[in-house]
């Protein structure tokens, strides 16, 4: 690292410290959703492989959760694998699934996070299903950030699964379709989502400069604030995170009003 890079790094750290010092923790979002985009483009820009990009993105996760802990965030939803990602070439998908499984094991072993899977388990390899179940059981009583790992997740699929779950539940209770139809409410559907009774995201961060949601938590983000960051996920820094929090705190949330 040359002198210019060292000075730039020092200035960024000083700036981050200043932003953090002015941050009102009472205005910090309690639930943050993250669309961790840009692993492949980061790798290409670095002249490296796609797999290396995914590994670099995975290594950023614990660091990010540490920043969330420092600022009193209570719930984080990390979109690790979408239902659309299963269409990727096998030579990329296979290693990516292995990296994601390692992430889940690492989060569970850390002891600071409570891991919860959101997504369709049946889409995942049996080994990953087992890893997710073990991680949830091992961290069920951890008093720390609730980390939703969105793996095999799609927003439309979540709503379809919620409706299916609602119908199955009604059938098991002997409820007629007529009675079910009359009892359907927004709250009832919400309770059957992957996130259940969790609070909806206050803030959704998407990295890489893309300004679209791609189906992320379609139901839960009706009143969420969005922050689009130009930085690729593996290069996401604490100062970028703090800027997102500062931007969120400066907004006036209308909740549809």
Set out the residue ranges of the language-model regions.
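Flexible, compositionally biased loop and terminal segments
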Residues: 1-257
